[in-house]
Structures are given as structure tokens and as C-alpha cells.
Amino acid sequence: MEERYYPVIFPDERNFRPFTSDSLAAIEKRIAIQKERKKSKDKAAAEPQPRPQLDLKASRKLPKLYGDIPPELVAKPLEDLDPFYKDHKTFMVLNKKRTIYRFSAKRALFILGPFNPLRSLMIRISVHSVFSMFIICTVIINCMFMANSMERSFDNDIPEYVFIGIYILEAVIKILARGFIVDEFSFLRDPWNWLDFIVIGTAIATCFPGSQVNLSALRTFRVFRALKAISVISGLKVIVGALLRSVKKLVDVMVLTLFCLSIFALVGQQLFMGILNQKCIKHNCGPNPASNKDCFEKEKDSEDFIMCGTWLGSRPCPNGSTCDKTTLNPDNNYTKFDNFGWSFLAMFRVMTQDSWERLYRQILRTSGIYFVFFFVVVIFLGSFYLLNLTLAVVTMAYEEQNRNVAAETEAKEKMFQEAQQLLREEKEALVAMGIDRSSLNSLQASSFSPKKRKFFGSKTRKSFFMRGSKTAQASASDSEDDASKNPQLLEQTKRLSQNLPVDLFDEHVDPLHRQRALSAVSILTITMQEQEKFQEPCFPCGKNLASKYLVWDCSPQWLCIKKVLRTIMTDPFTELAITICIIINTVFLAVEHHNMDDNLKTILKIGNWVFTGIFIAEMCLKIIALDPYHYFRHGWNVFDSIVALLSLADVLYNTLSDNNRSFLASLRVLRVFKLAKSWPTLNTLIKIIGHSVGALGNLTVVLTIVVFIFSVVGMRLFGTKFNKTAYATQERPRRRWHMDNFYHSFLVVFRILCGEWIENMWGCMQDMDGSPLCIIVFVLIMVIGKLVVLNLFIALLLNSFSNEEKDGSLEGETRKTKVQLALDRFRRAFSFMLHALQSFCCKKCRRKNSPKPKETTESFAGENKDSILPDARPWKEYDTDMALYTGQAGAPLAPLAEVEDDVEYCGEGGALPTSQHSAGVQAGDLPPETKQLTSPDDQGVEMEVFSEEDLHLSIQSPRKKSDAVSMLSECSTIDLNDIFRNLQKTVSPKKQPDRCFPKGLSCHFLCHKTDKRKSPWVLWWNIRKTCYQIVKHSWFESFIIFVILLSSGALIFEDVNLPSRPQVEKLLRCTDNIFTFIFLLEMILKWVAFGFRRYFTSAWCWLDFLIVVVSVLSLMNLPSLKSFRTLRALRPLRALSQFEGMKVVVYALISAIPAILNVLLVCLIFWLVFCILGVNLFSGKFGRCINGTDINMYLDFTEVPNRSQCNISNYSWKVPQVNFDNVGNAYLALLQVATYKGWLEIMNAAVDSREKDEQPDFEANLYAYLYFVVFIIFGSFFTLNLFIGVIIDNFNQQQKKLGGQDIFMTEEQKKYYNAMKKLGTKKPQKPIPRPLNKCQAFVFDLVTSQVFDVIILGLIVLNMIIMMAESADQPKDVKKTFDILNIAFVVIFTIECLIKVFALRQHYFTNGWNLFDCVVVVLSIISTLVSRLEDSDISFPPTLFRVVRLARIGRILRLVRAARGIRTLLFALMMSLPSLFNIGLLLFLVMFIYAIFGMSWFSKVKKGSGIDDIFNFETFTGSMLCLFQITTSAGWDTLLNPMLEAKEHCNSSSQDSCQQPQIAVVYFVSYIIISFLIVVNMYIAVILENFNTATEESEDPLGEDDFEIFYEVWEKFDPEASQFIQYSALSDFADALPEPLRVAKPNKFQFLVMDLPMVMGDRLHCMDVLFAFTTRVLGDSSGLDTMKTMMEEKFMEANPFKKLYEPIVTTTKRKEEEQGAAVIQRAYRKHMEKMVKLRLKDRSSSSHQVFCNGDLSSLDVAKVKVHND
């Protein structure tokens, strides 16, 4: 029977045994035996239960290993191949496609047995692939019907009944085949079938005409039929599984997000309740002005009402109106904080950054500008941190799944390798069994190709059967190690060979064993054959056909032509010429614009013909040179040929039809992609998109299904009311965004996926009469679509990027593009010419300056033969100098120190003098290109030195220079400054100045020669030393920082109001002069102290120098230098060189700049394609005719059809500032689309456009939306996420480069080190003593009990709920009740505070949480008192004090100890804070500089669009408010629009100060790139990195909390905090600990193994116990002893009194001593007994003599205890 448990794998039909009644009886017998074993609880007989095998799971394909399925057994019940199901009443069925299905062997529906003919028929139907395809087709057709049909009619119902019938039939077939619910593998046991069940149930309910259910709601369930596609396609199931896993992992993030959102919502509710309905009401406006819209003042050129406030910093009302509360809130009464629900929705909107700038502006106008800090917290903590944690979690979930898949693939590859090795091993064993070796050889020879045979022949390993011998074990150790790392591999290997005999020496070999051994070999043979077959590129017949017709070898003359052409076409210069043609052609394409003159059109037309001819010629010549067979095997050649043929078709079409506008003309832009061949980064981007699209195939289908479902759900639920004609007004006759049909519904869902959901939701609620269903559906689309699916997309993209980056970097080191090779040729030719010229000039110089060249040469040769003039020799001559700098090849010596010469002197003619101190040429005198740094790992990487210090390092052979250059590729993010900074630390700091000028300068110019020992120079040297000491002094640095801050602060006051304050203006001019002179003086001091050489070789000093030059130039009041005053805004940049935190971030940014610029260029090229396409599609079509009196009144196209008619009718023809009239404008338009700001106006104009200079019509060009959809997917999604990829990748590279300590530790050591690091900071604390006073003691017991804490927590939650229940429009009675409850809570928490102080006495104030509670109570009392006062009595809003009550909620945080996941997230935030603070500082600096520039350039811009009284560039505050808003790219289009209006939007009095629109575009685009794309992405990178670290830490076996709990338990056993407990108490202590440190009783023996040290009095120290318990959890490892000693030393430093307690014994030694004592006692007792017996024998016969009768009690032997204290 045991033989049947683990069936042998045969490579043929013997694997497949039909499932018969005997099979069922055998299963029942096995189940009975299993039950008997369980009853008898026979542990010896119990076996570990096998797991289901992954490759044999249901719905997977049967592995090829099992051979082909016999035709007669297809779709028939078979015995299960998986050993796991040996005692389950199941059988398996395989279809023709080898898909595995499992069924229960019990009766289906209690009627149909496994052998029933009807059930067998149903099984055959349900497993057939045609049945699955039929269901998929039905689902697709049904989806198409759902997307098209809207109204219910008889015609629509007929197909619905057909579909329902098909689904019911499918369910019936499956139920008859599987059973309904009771048994294993029955219909409802599969969760995917639950979906079918619900769909059918709802469909039947909707079919009955008399049913009372809501049919339209139930009909929306039909749409979930689309999910049936997932249940049929196995690949989709995997992706959905990954999605569900990521959702599981997101639980902690979601809980934390909801908690933070609730806090923000409560804060918002308390702060802004009833404030957003404040508006400017006109004076004397009727009886009820608060509810009359006509009484409200409106914004200029807008339908919005003016919002105002009465507090400091809020917006005042214009003359003729007053600020008062009304009944109307903004955005159709949907934006408000009047209750918790609306407040929560508003905060969710801010967190998702959807139209948040609108809410931000509304709050600041009504409440005051100081509430900007509330938004800073919500945006940075909520939006940036929590939403990016979602990204981090999803990325980790995806990567984890990816690792598992990779591990499985690796396991299979290893299995093939094992197979290759096993084949050879089995030969000897099979021969020993009596199998002919020749037959085996013939089998192998016939089965494998020569390549494989060679591979097999090269391996010599011991036989698989010789496991007993040591040699066999040794040889197999490697593979066993590999296998042990992967249990799946081990399992599969076992399955291959589990029943092979182990005993080789058994003479009577079982024939079955021999058969098994043979089958194992044949399986491996078949497997290898299949693998080879799989790896073959194409069929042999195809290859023959191709070589016959597609390889042209006609004649020798033809071959000569081919050879010449091949040489020409594959030459790098040809590739360079083609690339130049592509670039020129791209320029030609980009030059096209609206209203071109005829000459330019002709030039572009001819150019197009020429380039088409060139590309066609290139294609033809390459085909001739390479043959079609080889030409079309390369992807780029195929692409080139497609582009060339399309261009040719375009030219022919234009020539024949005289129509210059065709779709083919738009396809010319594909030529731009030809650049990717010679541009590696563009190539990488295209590869990433290609790989991602390939890998994302299944995910794209899932996303499509999700979008389809939501589109149809929206259409079904809201389509009747939420349509284009709902709420029609004169201003907005038709709605653009609605769900009237599938196309518009899809666009709404797509817009939500782009992040814009709130405006659509308002429209839906307005049309659906405020239905909450709108909120539910739209938030669901946002959460499911945006947060989960798109984040998985991003995770995949980042993963593709990092993989591609790895591949690309490896290729980049070895291969160059042909264009690079061609450029290298030019570079070499130029270098050769330059060198020849240099040599020629130097020869002439030497002849003039050297009258005795022979003697000079001889003298040089005598002293140092290699000291030739460095500039005059070629590279080769430096090879001979290697002996001077390196002891041997590749082994660098210590750096050569600079010779401390007192004399800066050179020999005649610039030759260097030789000295007894110098050995050879000094490194400082070599040309700059030879100053190179040998990498510390001795790999021959060379880099040019450009550090500040004189680091003269060893030189390597310059022959490797080209290799080094290629390694430092354009994508390299190596920060050389970091390396040099690390090296500089090793060099002792100089205490005196460097030389003033470079040596080369001193040698060639006599005026620069100085001698420190001679009189004029001694004074100079002393002055320099004094200056050096001054600039190096810490006070000097502090003073300069102070001056920088003051000078930056002074710039704030230079705003638009300065001319009206002459005193301030005068003071600022004076301070500006002082600051300039201070900076000038500092620069001169540094020149004198450091010398020009050192000063001008530092990048920071250059920055200081340029800023000082700008400051000096701005002092000269020359008209031509007026613009330099603006550049003083760069002055705060000096702070960068002074603050270390910002320096670190800047270094990280600088190191990423090459990669960022590369990606930026690639994005520009990628966008150029869409720009050119946009210009072709929309140029000249955005203009429209308007009625000049009303800017918003667009005229109908039936009245004014075109521009000429508009001009005739005296109307105005208006073209939007952002359009597609040329490529420059197109770039700006696409940036607005990519950032989703101002994109709706652009899309509306595109969709309404008809033809050039024609009046647009509503949605005349409806499918223009698709252009923007495609651009957003490829241009925005892929390219902008590439920025995140680059920066994260750069951060990872930097960490690898700098994080050295972990490299030298094993995984066990790392875990131990982390644990030690955590516990090293902890020590036991003395518990608070219980008071002696009875009353105090009672209160003490009360406040320290757990019940008290739970009650207080309950009260906090109750208080939070009551605060949530408050609303703005609540009745007075309810308000009064809430006030009383609030006072009651304040009283309760005050009493809690007082009784704690009473019970805990002074110890109360030693706990941080208690202090926090105390502060909250005091503030609550103050806020309660303040809120009683009237608003008029105080000058600040009392709402500010009501917020203080919310701080009480913070106490809940101390009770979330059980929520480990949330703690991890908060820990990640804490770890991120230092880095985030530095990034925040840098962002503030950027904002500060841009604010100053903004004040200089845009202070006179007329108000309009996004520029108003509060948000403007007139003052520093207004500028910072605007810049904070556009840090998230929000609303930057509204700030830019007024500035694009150039002169007409300037104030008439200040035309001179009005800037060009181009400056505004550069200003905003550069700020968005710097802040939004770079700094914010650095923020994301830090969070991702720290989240990974925090997750790793949380997954450590021991965390901070484990150590804290250890010490909490310790306090109970050590109330005096002596750090010692008695050995007798150790057992109870160890048992009282929680897992994983707990050592459960009985634990005495485990303490002996731990060998714990004890001190006098049998006491144990806490650290010794903790070390031992930690080692027990982590496991002992080599190398931990050193670390343990190190950590003990660290602890002893922190706790010096431990040194007084030196351990005198250990638990093990004590046990040994006790055992020794017991042995001695026993021996002594035996000795005494023997002595007594002897004495009794020899005793005299005298009767009065008495002895002890053998009773040893009087000797107290048993009580003797040996103490060795």
C-alpha cells in the first residue's frame, strides 16, 4: 500500500491511472487507517503531513515531466498525482491543454456518484477548453451590450434573457459536475463561483416584472460579470492575488490614515465650523440678505462670490458691502466643515490633492493667512507621507511576490542542472543492477545534442546511490546546500528520486527498483529534450526557406558590392551621418507652426522629400548589404523600414492628392524615435515601457475590467440624471463631464484615476439631489482604482527601471553605440592635433630658453632621469614613472605628501629643481589629466581629482584612462566629493595657509615667486597666518551665518509697498551696503588666508564669489546694471555652504543631476513627438469668436462660422494663451496636461475644435479626448514616474556606496547587532514606591491599575465621538448639552490629573505622558474659560483654543502597543524626520529665493484668475503662499495665465516693470521641476527607504518593545532597581516574560545551558540575563562573542557601578559544584558505612561498648553542602 502513497513518475501513460471503484476503496481504507492512528495516538507511527504541491494545484498546467496524456483518459477521472490527496476522497481530471481540475469523489447533490454517466458527461463538458472559450465570448458580448444599451425595452430584454440562460446553464453544469456546497471542490467552495451565484441571483430577480425590488440597482450587479474573465484566465488570477495581498498589507496604513484623517477632520471641524459661509453682502439689500444670492458680491470675471473674514489676515470686503454669515457654502454648498462628515470629506480631498488649492484659498480668505500652517501639516504629513506609504507597501508586496516567482524559476533551473548531473551519476548504479551500459549510452547519445553531451562529459561526480561513502557526501554537499535554501527544489528533487534504492550491495535487486531507476533517467532525458526544443529559435524548415530566398549570394561581383556596402553601412561615421539627419529632420518637424509663410512651407516640404529619400536609401542599402534575412532580424531595422515606408506613402499621397494634411503626415514624428539607437537613455526608456507593457499585460486587463465596471456602474446608477443637459444654465448650457453614455462615463472614471474626483462628485450630487451614493461610488473609484491598481503599476515600473538600470549599466561598461565610436574618432584626432601643436611649440620654447640643452639634460639624467618637463611628453612616457609611485603593479603606496618648501621657486625655464627631500616628480607638477585616484578596492577605476585639498595620490597606468572614462558614464551617479571628503578625514588638518598661486603659475611668472624667509615676505606670511586663524575661527563662521540671515531677511521688505515707506527704503539701502562690504571683506580675507588656488578650486567659494560680485554690481546705480539687483535673491544660497544638513541633501542632488538631466532630455524628446502631433492636429483651431462685452459669452458657430465673419461682425477673435500653434506652446500645454492643472480648458478647446480659424462647436471633435488619454498614459505616467525611479535608484546607489558596516556582517550578526543596539540604550528603572498613607495607598492602587487606564481610554474615545457629533447648525439645546458634556470631560480629566499627582507625588512629573496629560488639562481649562468670552472681547479666534482639546486624543497613542504594524509606520516616520527636515529646509530655501524673484518680476501684474488680494507677488507673504500652493503643482496655471497676457494685463502706471511672458513661463516651469519633481520625489525616496528599514526592523525577532517589556517585568522582581535578582527568582521571572523572550517552566535545565554568571549572594545581573535570553532567541553564531564583549563594555560605560559586581561563579559551575559536592557526600557516606561495618566485625565482646548502630544521622553527612563562595 505504501507504494501507492507516493506514485512513481513515469514518462508515459503509466503515470495516469483511471479512477475506479477500487481506487475509491483504497482511499477509504487509508482514511480508516489514519483515523485509527489518531485514536491510538501512536506518536511513533505519526508522519509529517505532506503539503499540496505547487505545480499540481488546480487550474495549473500539468508539468511536462509527467509525459503525454493518453487520448482515452482525457477528461476522464484519474487517480490524483499529488501525494497530499492520498487520503482525500478526490480525483483529478485533465483536459487536452493539460489543465488540472479536481472533483470530490463523494456523491454530488447526494445523488450523483463519481461514476454516474450524467455526472461524467457534465465533468467532460465543464473541463473542455471550448466551454471556457464560449463563456469568455459570452461575457465579452454581454459587456458590449451593457456598454451600449441604456433604456429598458423588449428588444434589450431578449439578449438579457439569453445571457441569463447561458449563465444558468453554466452553473447547472458545474453544480452537477462538482456538487453544490457540502464537499471538497464543490461549486460554492470556489470564491470565484460566489460571483456567478450573485450575478445569476440578481439577474433572475430583475426578470420578474411584478417584483418589488429596485431593478436599476440590481441591474448594476450585471456588470460584475466582467470579473468572470478573471476566473477563466489563470494569469489574471495571479495578479488579482497580488492585489489582494497588497490590500491585506495595506490594512495598517489604512488604519493609520483613517486615524490621522479623523484627527485632521476634527481639527478642521473645530477651527472652520460655520466660517466658509461668510460672504460680502451689499448694503441695504432687502429684508433677508443672508439667503439672497443677488445680495452677494461676485469676483471680477467670475461667477464665484467674494469670500471674506473678520479676523487678522483674512480678506476684507470691498466698499459698499460688509462681511457676514450666509446660508450658502461654496461649491453648491458641498464644501464646508459644519459637521464631522463634511470635514472628513474635505480633509480626504486635501490629502488626495484634488483641487485642494481652491479649499486652501477659501480658508485663508475667511480665516486668515496664519492657517497656512494647518495645510502645511496636512499636505506634508497626510498627503506626502501617508499616501506614499501606500506606494511603499504596494511596492513591497509586489517585490515580495516577484521574489517568490524568481525563486520558483531559479528552483526549476537548478532542477535542470541537477538533472544534467544526475544522468551521469545513475550510469554506474544501473550497470550494477545489471542494465547494459551501452543501451544507456545510446539512450543518452540519441537524446542530447553534441553541446549537451559535451556538458555531461565535462562533469565527473560520484554515483547517486553511493550516499554512504564520505566522498559522495562531500561531492554532493554543494547541491545539498543549494537545495536546502529552497524547499521547493528539495521537494522536487526528492520526487525525482524518492524511491531509488540506497543499498548498492544488495545482490537481489528488486525489478521494480530497476524500473524506477530507468524511468528516472528517461524522465530527465525527456525534460532535457523539451528544454532544448523550447530554446530553439525557429523551425528547421523555416530556416531553410529563409536562407534560400532571403540570403542573396548571386555572383562574385554581387558579393563584392555587398562587401563594400556592408563596410560603408556598418561604419560608425555612416551611423553618425544618419543620426545628424534624424536630428535635422526633428528640427524641421518642430519648426512647423500656425500661420507659416509660403517660403518656410516650401523649405519644409523639400526637406521632407530629402529626408524621406535619405531614409529610403539607407533602408535599401542596408537590405542589400546585410541581406533581408539578417536585416529584418533586428528590431530597430524593422522599425526603420516601417517609418521609411510610411514616409514614402505620405509623400506619394501628398503628391497625388494635393492635400498637405493627412494622417500619414502625423506619423512622421516616429522618426524621432530613431534617435534611441544612438541614445542609450532613450533606448532604456523605450525598453522599460516595452518590458512594462509586456509584464503589465495581465494587470492592464485587470485595470481595464475595473475601469469598465465602474464606467457601467456609473452609467447605470447616475446616467438618467447625471447627463449633459442636467442643470442647464445660460452660462453652461451643456455639461461636459457626465455618465449619460459609456464613452463619457469612461472619461469620468479615467479623470478620477488621474486624481480629479471631487468636482465630478459635486456634479453627480447636484444632479442626483445630494444622493450619498455619489460619494460612495466616487470615493470607491478613487481608492480602488487610484491607490491600489495605479500604485501596482508604479511598483512594476520602478521594478522594471531598476532591472533595466542594472542591465544597462553592465552593457554600458563593455559596449558603445556607433555614434559614440564615431565621436571618439573625432576626439582622438583632435587630441593628436593638439598634442602635435603643443610638442612643436614646446620644442621652440626649449630652444629659446635652454642655451645648453645637452648639459641640462645630463644634469637631469644624473639626478632623476624621469623628471622631464611634464607638459611636453606624450602619455606613453608616463608608463616609465610607475615605479616612482607604486611599489608594484596595482599596489598603491601611501599618498605623497607635498614638500613643505619655504621658497616657492622653480628652476630656469620652468624646469623643476631637484632636492634631496623629493624623490622624482612631485604629483602637484603633473598635468591635471595625470592627477588620478586609484580606487581603494584596486580595480583600476580612475577619476580626476578636483578636491580642495592637496591630495597627491598614487597614479595608475594611463593606458586604462579610456576604460575609466567609459565606466563613468553619463548616467553615473557616483559622488566624487564624498570619496574625497572621506579621504580628507585621514589627512591631518593644516594649521597654516596653502600657497597663494598654483605652482605652475609661480614657475612661469617671476612676480609670483615668494620666499617666506626674506624680509618683505615674512610680514606677508604673518598677515596670511593671521587671516587664516580669523577665517577658521568658529565665531567668524557664526558671524557670517548671522549676516547671511540678516541680509536675506532684508530682502523680504523690498516689496511693492517699499516706495511708500521712504524711511524703510533708506534703511534697507544702508544695510545692503553694509552687508555687501562685509561679504567683500570676508572674500578678501579668504583670498589672503587660503590663496587663490584653494579658494577657486572650491565650488562653494565660487558660489560665494559670484554672489559677492552680483552684490557689488548692484551697488552701482547704472541703468545697464539694474537687472543685477534682482540677482541678489541668490544671496540666501550662501546658507547652503554653512548648514551641514542642507549640504548633505545638495550633495545627494548634485550626484543625481546627470541622471536627472538625462531623463529630462529624454522626456523632452518623448514629449516632442506628442507636441508635433498636437501641432498637426490642433494648430490654429483653438481660437473662438466672443462678444467683446462679456468675456464668457461665446457665440454659436451657426451665427459666426469663422474668423473672417467674426471680424466683419465687429466681435473679438480670442485665442487662448495656452494652445498648440507651435511646439513651444505645445510643450507648455502638455506640461499642464501632465500635471493635471489647467488641462480641462485645453481638452475642452481641443474637443470643440473644428478646422483652422473656424468657430468651435460643443464636442465637435469628441474623440480628441483619446489624444490626451494616450499622452497621459505614456507621456505623463511613464516619463514622470521615471523621475521617481531615477532619484530612488540614485539614493540606493549612494547607500550602497556609503553604508559600509553592514557589508562585513553576516545575517545572524546583523540581527544580533540590531538587538544589542536596542538593548544597549535601556536599563531597569526603579518603580514608583507605594505610599505609606492608607488613603494615598488606596488612590495609588486605583491609578496604577489597568482597569483605570481602560476607563480613561473609554472616556477619551467618548469625548472624541461627542466632538464629532457637533455641528454648525445644531439647535441651542443641543449646543448647550454639548457644552455641559465638554465641561464634564474637562472636570473628569482634571480630577484624573489631580488624583494622579496626589497618589504618585513628585514621581508624577518624571513620566513624559503624565506631563503631556497635565499640559492638556491646563490648556483645556483655559480654552473652556476663553470660549465663555464673547468674540468682541478678544483679538484672536477662540476656536484656536478649542483645538487644544484634541491633544487629549494623543494619549491613545500610548495604548496602541498591540498594533505592531502601525508602530512600524510611526517608527518609519521617526526615522525619516532628520532627512525630511533637511529636505524641508532646502525646499524652504528654494521657495525663499523664488519668492524674492517673484516680488522683483511680478509685483505689478494685474489681478485676475489666480492672482488676488491675498495670493499675489506683491509681498513676501503672498509670494510664499503662492509658492507653497504650487509645490504640489496645484493651480500653477491660474497664477501663470495673468502673466501670459503680457502688456495688456500690466498696470498702466508701471509698464516698465512688466516682464515678458517668457520669463513667467521659465519661472513657473523651473520651480515645478525643482520643487514638485525633484525635492518632493526626494521626500518620497526617503520615506520608501526608511519604510523598508523600519519593516526589516519590525521583522527582527526582537524589537524595542520586547526589551521594554523585559524591564517592566524586571521591575516587579527588582523593586529597588538594583539591577540584580536572586537566582531562586529566575525561574518565575523567565516564565513571567512574554514571547519570544519567555522561558516556560520547567526551565532549570535551560538556565544551566545558558551558563549565567552570578555574583556574591547568588544574584544575577539584568544584562547577563538579557544577553543570555537574546542569544537563545537569535541562536548562537560564530563571531557573536566579540560583539557581546563590545556591547558589555558599552553598557558598563553607561552603568559604571556594575564594575563593582564581578561575577564569581556561573549557573553551570554552580551546578557542577553541587554535583561534585553530592559525589563527595556519597563517597564519604559509603566510606563511613564501610568503616562502621569493619568496626562492627572487630568489635570486642564487652557489652558496655556502644557505637552508632549504622545510623549516620548524628554525623549530619546528608546535610553537608559544599559552598565555594
Swiss-Prot record:
The keyword Cell membrane applies. Residues 1-126, 178-189, 237-252, 398-567, 627-634, 683-697, 799-1029, 1093-1098, 1140-1158, 1289-1341, 1401-1406, 1464-1478, 1585-1765 are cytoplasmic. Residues 340-364, 742-762, 1224-1245, 1516-1538 dip into the membrane without crossing it. Activity is not sensitive to inhibition by tetrodotoxin. One of its GO terms (molecular function) is voltage-gated sodium channel activity. III repeats lie at residues 1022-1319. IV repeats lie at residues 1328-1619. Pfam families: Ion_trans (PF00520), IQ_SCN5A_C (PF24609), Na_trans_assoc (PF06512). It is a multi-pass membrane protein. It comes from the Eukaryota. CDD domains: Na_channel_gate (cd13433). The chain crosses the membrane at residues 127-148, 158-177, 190-209, 217-236, 253-266, 372-397, 568-591, 603-626, 635-656, 663-682, 698-720, 773-798, 1030-1052, 1067-1092, 1099-1116, 1118-1139, 1159-1180, 1262-1288, 1342-1365, 1377-1400, 1407-1430, 1441-1463, 1479-1501, 1560-1584. Disulfide bonds join C280-C317, C764-C774. Induction: Down-regulated after axotomy and up-regulated following hind paw inflammation. Down-regulated in vitro by electrical stimulation and by deprivation of NGF. One of its GO terms (cellular component) is voltage-gated sodium channel complex. Sodium channel mediating the voltage-dependent sodium ion permeability of excitable membranes. Assuming opened or closed conformations in response to the voltage difference across the membrane, the protein forms a sodium-selective channel through which sodium ions may pass in accordance with their electrochemical gradient. Involved in membrane depolarization during action potential in nociceptors which function as key relay stations for the electrical transmission of pain signals from the periphery to the central nervous system. Also involved in rapid BDNF-evoked neuronal depolarization. Belongs to the sodium channel (TC 1.A.1.10) family. Nav1.9/SCN11A subfamily. The sequence contains 4 internal repeats, each with 5 hydrophobic segments (S1, S2, S3, S5, S6) and one positively charged segment (S4). Segments S4 are probably the voltage-sensors and are characterized by a series of positively charged amino acids at every third position. This is Sodium channel protein type 11 subunit alpha. It comes from Rattus norvegicus (Rat).
